[in-house]
A protein has these predicted regions:
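Alpha-helical transmembrane segments of integral membrane proteins
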Residues: 1, 29-33, 60-65, 136-140, ...
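Helix-loop-helix hairpins and the membrane-proximal interhelical loops
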Residues: 6-57, 217-261
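Hydrophobic faces of transmembrane alpha-helices in multi-pass small-molecule transporters and flippases
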Residues: 31-35, 67-75, 101, 105, ...
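Alpha-helical transmembrane segments of multi-pass membrane proteins
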Residues: 37-42, 69-74, 232, 267-275, ...
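Short helix-coil transition sites and intra-membrane helix breaks within transmembrane domains
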Residues: 38-47, 52-54, 73-83, 274-287
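Membrane-water interface at loop-to-transmembrane-helix junctions
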Residues: 184-230
Length: 358
């Protein structure tokens, strides 16, 4: 309902014929740059998973999985579609759930860690041209960075605490607990048999995931994953910069009239709207509203902001959904090499275990 109201209001600010004309007359060289930089971002994101997984899955399958992840990530609210990555690497490529969850959590938090300093740099670059509230945005970016660094540091202990809590909740164990949360859980009666079994499996998965997070730190992945995450973010926003230029060329805009730091801030606001629970199917309505709000504050006329929001969203969705659907169909095809992939995974895991023991 909220999305429908937003769509109605935003579409009332423009003529549909203008939107069609913008899409038809899109600047093809800039559109090609969008595709190329998006491809570079795909490789970088896949490489990050490859590093986090210690090479358990080859780059090409990870690129396919990432395309599927891109298909679902904006389709559902609060980016829960990104969990499709966990399903794909476990169900289709035989990766253990704990390794999949550890790589998923670490990639997510490193994404947030990477965007915070980039936001601060963009705010510094625009300087006095930013409207009132720039200091608040800088403070939020710094807070985001600090929070994410704390989350990285406490991820392993937090997962173990959650595992302990669920284990106690499942068994109703009355032994002394290590925290008020587990102590409160221990005073309760055991959960029903079915629920207890489910909670027990979840507790074991979380404990194993914590072990995998610790193993990642021991492998020294923090710096390379952070650097790759910076590249991922720069590719994403660089691609959108080219896409925005492509749709605004028919309206008289040039590279010199589109400041990259300004575009970065505007796109960042629209992207953050996808994490909200009110995010609609494919984000239509909420995305354009956040885009329009951000870019009008940064100096674009309302009509141009609305037009560019719809045009960039439509083109990017066609690009992501088209490639993601093809990748999904390819992955879901019956493949005779699935058992081999699982054997390769088990072999790689045992080799990694032996190497850590050397």
């Amino acid at each position: 309902l909220i999305s429908a109201a937003l769509l109605y209001y935003l579409l009332s600010q423009i003529e549909v014929a203008q939107l069609v004309s913008t899409l038809v007359n899109v600047h093809l060289p800039s559109l090609a740059l969008f595709v190329l930089i998006s491809a570079a971002g795909l490789v970088a994101r896949s490489l990050r998973y490859w590093v986090l997984l210690a090479g358990r899955i080859r780059i090409w399958p990870l690129m396919l999985v990432t395309l599927v992840r891109n298909l679902f990530v904006d389709l559902l609210p609060a980016r829960i579609g990104s969990l499709s990555y966990v399903y794909m690497v476990t169900a289709r490529y035989g990766l253990p759930l704990d390794e999949a969850l550890a790589s998923f959590f670490l990639a997510f938090v490193f994404d947030m860690v990477a965007i915070a300093p980039l936001l601060l740099l963009a705010l510094l670059a625009v300087g006095g041209t930013l409207p009132a509230g720039g200091g608040v945005l800088a403070g939020l970016a710094a807070l985001l960075l600090a929070g994410c660094l704390v989350a990285l540091y406490l991820m392993g202990p937090a997962l173990r605490l959650a595992a302990r809590f669920l284990s106690v909740l499942a068994s109703g164990d009355s032994e002394p607990a290590s925290s008020p949360a587990t102590s409160a859980a221990a005073t309760k009666a055991p959960a029903p048999r079915f629920a207890a079994a489910w909670l027990g499996r979840l507790a074991r998965s979380l404990a194993s995931t914590a072990d995998q997070v610790d193993a990642s730190w021991r492998r020294g992945v923090a710096l390379p994953v952070f650097m790759i995450s910076i590249v991922v973010r720069l590719c994403k926003f660089g691609a959108y910069y080219c896409l925005l230029h492509a749709v605004l060329v028919p309206h008289g805009y040039t590279w010199s009239t589109l400041s990259f730091p300004m575009v970065f801030l505007g796109v960042a606001g629209a992207e953050l709207s996808a994490t909200l629970p009110v995010h609609s199917l494919a984000g239509f309505g909420t995305y354009e509203a956040a885009w329009t709000l951000g870019f009008t504050q940064l100096g674009l006329p309302t009509e141009i902001a609305v037009l560019s929001g719809f045009a960039t969203h439509l083109i990017s969705q066609i690009h992501d959904y088209g490639l993601g659907l093809l990748a999904f169909l390819w992955i879901m095809l019956p493949r005779r090499d699935r058992p081999a992939a699982r054997d390769e995974k088990r072999t790689g895991r045992s080799e990694a275990g032996s190497s850590t023991g050397e």
